[in-house]
């Protein structure tokens, strides 16, 4: 089957009718753009309601500006709207990883609701991805490599060229007289993917003509086996993960290590996090899951923190220390630190009504200065019929995790605590 007919059949089964093409300007994405431009001419048969392209300008090559211009000229030729997005690449974890992260985050910013991202990954890319996963010691999920349709970083992705080899794309490009750019970094074998592409895989293909197809079959077997494991564990997973960013530990410690790691991987995948290594998962289980009952353990995984409280794991972002903040409330709205949103106040004849997120509290008016603080130690009277109690005990009764307690806005009249917004107000003693 030829490229055009195959992609046409794929689009008839696709779950979207609006598409955003990832366009680098290289051979693969240029062929992809040409194919979609041709398919658009078959309207209304395919019902492609929207077609756009996006080019990510990484700024890593001296030729980056000319590549962006080439992509613009190409899209003008095909009459397809193009977005050019410049990004800054964080090289902390390597250029390849940083560029990939920056690229997908930039694309996610522009991807519209009901729009599907289309990438030009082909069969040779699939082989490289499989070998890179093998090099990392990946399990079934990693060795499953890429699927024709999947979700990545919360985006629906279609890879319609996955069944075709690069030579097949080259044949199409030559017949259509397409022009494309060549990234000079593709020859740099310091990068793992280039080393495989330029040095290792050509030798294997020379010996075994159908090597890429065999790798694709193995990847598909791995993917299907992982799906089977997920299906078999789905009932247990639903019991442990009833809230997306929480994981109940009841009965969990009785499972085998293999079942524990599989369920935790499912939880992390549910939250769209990159898979940790086996060593990291074992450390998470030993240091957090099996930590002493009175401990408040935590484990950092990339840009997230896994914490434990009342026999549950919680997935949170790293939080700033807010205990030194003292914010004067001098207007009707106050912007709170560390992405906590705004606190606002309304006034009626006798009271002030404070609003924060979905919470509110009504307090009597005052002539004292009003401030918002975070974190408090000492005793408070939070119920009219109960004595003053240590605030730590109150937080425990309310089921507020330790890391959240210093993130709840506390309203002070002068130096007197009046309320923890959304949780309790302080009553006077008589």
UniProtKB/Swiss-Prot annotation:
One MF term in the entry's GO annotations: tRNA(Ile)-lysidine synthase activity
A single GO cellular-component term on record: cytoplasm
Positions annotated to bind ATP: 24-29
EC nos: 6.3.4.19
Gene3D superfamilies the record matches: 1.20.59.20, HUPs
CDD domains, A to Z: TilS_N (cd01992)
Enzyme class: ligase
Catalytic activity: cytidine(34) in tRNA(Ile2) + L-lysine + ATP = lysidine(34) in tRNA(Ile2) + AMP + diphosphate + H(+)
Cell location: Cytoplasm
Pfam family, one: ATP_bind_3
Alphabetical GO biological process terms: tRNA modification
Keyword tags: ATP-binding, Cytoplasm, Ligase, Nucleotide-binding, tRNA processing
Organism domain of life: Bacteria
Protein function: Ligates lysine onto the cytidine present at position 34 of the AUA codon-specific tRNA(Ile) that contains the anticodon CAU, in an ATP-dependent manner. Cytidine is converted to lysidine, thus changing the amino acid specificity of the tRNA from methionine to isoleucine.
Entry's free-text remark on domains: The N-terminal region contains the highly conserved SGGXDS motif, predicted to be a P-loop motif involved in ATP binding.
Family: Belongs to the tRNA(Ile)-lysidine synthase family.
Name of the molecule in the record: tRNA(Ile)-lysidine synthase
Natural source organism: Haemophilus influenzae (strain PittGG)
Lineage of producing organism: Bacteria, Pseudomonadati, Pseudomonadota, Gammaproteobacteria, Pasteurellales
């Amino acid at each position: 089957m030829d490229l055009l007919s195959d992609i046409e059949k794929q689009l008839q089964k696709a779950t979207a009718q609006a598409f955003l093409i990832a366009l680098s300007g290289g051979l693969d994405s240029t062929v992809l753009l040409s194919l979609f431009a041709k398919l658009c001419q078959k309207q209304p048969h395919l019902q492609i309601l929207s077609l756009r392209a996006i080019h990510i300008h990484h700024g890593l090559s001296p030729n980056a500006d000319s590549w962006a211009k080439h992509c613009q000229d190409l899209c003008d030729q095909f009459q397809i709207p193009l977005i050019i997005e410049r990004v800054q690449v964080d090289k902390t974890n390597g250029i390849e990883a940083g560029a990939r992260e920056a690229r997908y985050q930039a694309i996610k910013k522009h991807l519209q609701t009901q729009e599907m991202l289309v990438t030009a990954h082909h069969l040779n890319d699939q082989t490289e991805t499989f070998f890179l996963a093998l090099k990392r010691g990946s399990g079934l999920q990693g060795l499953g490599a890429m699927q024709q349709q999947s979700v990545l970083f919360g985006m629906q992705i279609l890879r319609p060229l996955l069944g075709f080899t690069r030579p097949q794309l080259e044949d199409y490009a030559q017949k259509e007289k397409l022009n494309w750019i060549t990234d000079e970094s593709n020859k740099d074998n310091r990068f793992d993917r280039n080393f495989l592409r330029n040095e290792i895989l050509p030798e294997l293909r020379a010996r075994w003509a159908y090597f890429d197809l065999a790798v694709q079959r193995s990847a598909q077997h791995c993917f299907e086996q992982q799906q089977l494991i997920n299906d078999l564990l789905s009932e247990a997973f639903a019991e442990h993960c009833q809230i997306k960013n929480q994981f109940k530990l009841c009965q969990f410690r009785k499972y085998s290590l293999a079942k524990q790691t599989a369920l935790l991987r499912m939880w992390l995948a549910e939250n769209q996090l990159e898979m940790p290594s086996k060593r990291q998962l074992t450390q998470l289980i030993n240091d957090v899951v099996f930590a002493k009952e009175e401990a408040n353990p935590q484990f950092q995984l990339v840009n997230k923190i896994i914490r434990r409280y009342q026999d549950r794991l919680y997935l949170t972002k790293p939080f700033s220390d807010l205990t030194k903040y003292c914010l004067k409330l001098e207007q009707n709205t106050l912007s709170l630190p560390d992405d906590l949103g705004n606190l606002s106040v309304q006034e009626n004849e006798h009271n002030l009504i404070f609003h924060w997120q979905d919470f509110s509290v009504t307090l009597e008016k005052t002539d004292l200065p009003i401030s918002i603080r975070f974190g408090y130690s000492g005793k408070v009277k939070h119920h009219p019929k109960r004595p003053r109690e240590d605030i730590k005990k109150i937080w425990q009764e309310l089921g507020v995790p330790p890391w959240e307690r210093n993130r709840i806005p506390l309203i002070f009249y002068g130096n007197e605590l009046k309320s923890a917004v959304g949780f309790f107000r302080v009553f006077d003693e008589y």
